[in-house]
Structures are given as structure tokens and as C-alpha cells.
């Protein structure tokens, strides 16, 4: 991790990888007084690690003069200021954890440190990084998570540790030169575009960097030009001989303990980031490919003649496609129409089922009424014929008791033709009415069957026609009842007429009193004496 530039960690990624360093080990929770009491023995101790996390420290005093100290854990305290000679008193420090404190600035003496590799500043109200931090060539990991940084700009911070140090070195070189009035009117460095930002590249070794520093000290203007040129994409193949030498040196390679510590810290920070993503729906640890391409667009080497014709990456290629309000309104309208159509179809099906149920119930009632009428008719037909036979057998003629002769009740010569023809006419009329009713009923049944076969009409129209059919059926039923009632009345009248004739003929057959019937006596005398 520490020996080559391939282990460089960007600030945002380092924040994710170094979240919970203080959570991996058992942290002492003793107050600051106890800490000050026990530090006296630590000063002369040869232990390279000192853990004072969550100790309630408010300031750092001379108790930290431990030259052999390599790892110092001060997270979750109340520190506000770091002494100016802090890094000079701890020359062998490689790991410094200052997370969750109240530090607003770092001392400028950090630039002279030669062994610092990891610096954790998460959750500190720090707004500006010291320019001297760019000269710490041994720094491999920098955690700036949740820090309200204003210098360097956020675009530079997002590029990573290499870009931050390069920006700070360039700033220091530019502001160390004497400026003319024209250079003072130049726009500030913070108004940089994406194309002007530094890109992470291969770092040179410490010897090469020292040689370059010596050259820059001799020629400041040339150093500025070289620092500016380092922002542009490389044109020539870099010389890797120095890089190979630095890679071969064993002292630059990370130790097994540091690798284990980095890995453990990374695992805990990844778990913490997963919890944050689930809670607040934050962005992923790695940027999308489109954003990476937009940030690293300066790596591409454009042709000189096509510099002004090249199109910048549009927002559509970086951001996801969003529906316009018009398209959203159209989609919502279509969804509403589909719901309305489904509801309308369901209502039509329900109305059709209800209509079929009503028609079935009406047909069942009509059949029951017809069956009752048929049974009544059969009962009447069973009762009437025996009476007719009895009347016909008993009323062919009347018996005269005087001369013991049968006298016809209605002599053929004396019967009126109208009385003989009236029963025949009534029978013909009743038969004609019955035929007409049968034809009407058949036509009505055929119409109902045709309507049932055709289902293309609206439910309301079908309900109206069903009501009309029901009214017609009730009218036909009333006519049938009237016709049957008329037939029964005619039969009763004929029966009453027959019984009346019998009552008129029976007294003539009985013995008559001749003393009270002078007319009969006179007629009898006439008959006798003639």
C-alpha cells in the first residue's frame, strides 16, 4: 500500500475504507484525568501504538513526546486545535486517526513529515487543507468524509489523493512567485473546469521527486510550467526506470501488519456504508461509467484540428432518461382509460347477468301461471261433461201423467231459430279467439327467442325490450283468462237455460186442478165435446 502509487486511495473512497478504525478494537472509556495520569508511563514505553479514542481529550500537551510512536488513535474526542510542533515531536508517526473531533485546521508543520502514510480526518469541521500537505510524498490514504472542504474545490477532492496533492503543490508554487499586475488580475484557481482538473497518474519515486524539487528551486517559472503541464494528458512515454527502482526497494512495500489493518478497516467501513445506503439511499462507492468518463475526459488525446469540433458529453449520457411532464400525463391518461374500460366492461357483464336472471325468473313465473291455468282448465273439463250427459239423459222430453204419453219439451215447430243458432255462433267466436291468441303467443315467443340470440344491444335497450315482452305476455295471459272466463260463463248460462226449461215443463206433467184453471177446463171441455 505504501510503496507504490498503485495503492493510492481517493479521498471519497478512503472515507469509505476508513470508517471504523476505532470500532475494530476494544476502546478504553476512561476520562481525561485518568489518561493524563497514565501517560507518564507511556512516554518511556517502547510500544509503537497508542490508543486514546473516546477519552474526552480537549487538547494535546507535551505528554505526546514519544519519538518511537507509529500509530496514534485519537478518534471520538473533543480536540479543537493541533499544536504546531505536533508532527515534529512524532517523527516516526505513520498512522494518525483524528476522526469525530472538532479540528478546524491542520498545522503547517505536516509538510516536513517523512513517514506519515494514513491521515483520517472524517467528521471534522475543517474547511481548508494546508498547502504543505502536498509535499508529504509518503501519504497514501486521506479520509475527508463529511468534511465541509472549500479548499481544494470539491471537483479536485473527488479526483483523489494524487489530484489533491498536485493541486496543493501547484498552488504553493504559483503563490511563491512574484506576480506582476497582469498576473494579479488572473481569475482564481477555484473557477476551474473539468478539463483543468488534475488526473490521477503515475507518481515518481522519492529520489526523483527530490531531484525535481531541486530543479524547481533553481528555476521557479519552469516549475510552474511543469506543474501546469502535469494537468494535461501525457504525450510521450514516461521513463519507468526510477519507478522500477522504487518498486524494487523493500522499504516502500507495506508490512503485513499494515495490510491486515487496512483490510480490517475496509471491511468495517463497507458494512457502515451499506447501512447508510439502506437508510438514506446514498450513491454507490464507485461512480457510474458515464461520470467516470466525464471526469477523466482529459485522458483522451484529441487531434488538434478537431479540438473545436469535439462535442462535450451531454447530460443525457450521464444522467438517466427522465420522462417529460407531457409523457407522464399521457401515460396517466392511458392508464385511467384502461381502468375505465375495464370497469365499464365489468358493469356491462353484471347488467347482462342481472337481465338474464330477471328474464329467467319472469319466464319461470309465466310458465307456472300457464301450468296453473292448464290444470284449472283440465279440472273444469273433467267436471262439466258428466253434468251435460245427465241433463241430456233426463231432459229429452216430459211425461204427461194424464194420458201417460211423452211430450217433447220443445216441439220442433215451436222452437225459435235464434235460440238454436246462438250456441253455435258463440262456439265459433270462442274458437276464433283461441286461434288468434295462440298465434299471438307463438309470435311473442319467437320474438323473445330472436332477441336472446342477438346480444349486441346495449344493456338498457335489452332491459326495456324485456319489460315490453313481459307486458305483452301479461296482456296475452289476461286475454286467455278472459276468454276462458267467457266460455265458463256461456256454459253456465246454457246450463241455467236447460234447467229453466226443465222447471217449466215439469208442472205440466203433474196432476192439475181443473177448478182453478178455467182456461184449461174450457179447453178440456172443447176437446171432450168435440
Curated annotation (Swiss-Prot):
InterPro entries: Leu-rich_rpt, Leu-rich_rpt_typical-subtyp, LRR-SigEffector_domain, LRR_dom_sf
Region (Disordered): 178-215, 402-432
Disulphide-bonded residues: none
Source species, domain of life: Eukaryota
Database matches in Gene3D superfamilies: Ribonuclease Inhibitor
Coiled coil, from the record: 327-385
Database matches in PANTHER family: LEUCINE-RICH REPEAT AND IQ DOMAIN-CONTAINING PROTEIN 4 (PTHR45752:SF187), LEUCINE-RICH REPEAT-CONTAINING (PTHR45752)
Gene that encodes the chain: LRRC27
Keywords assigned: Coiled coil, Leucine-rich repeat, Repeat
Name this protein carries in UniProt: Leucine-rich repeat-containing protein 27
Keyword Iron-sulfur: no
LRR repeat ranges, renumbered to this chain: 46-67, 68-89, 92-113, 115-136, 138-159
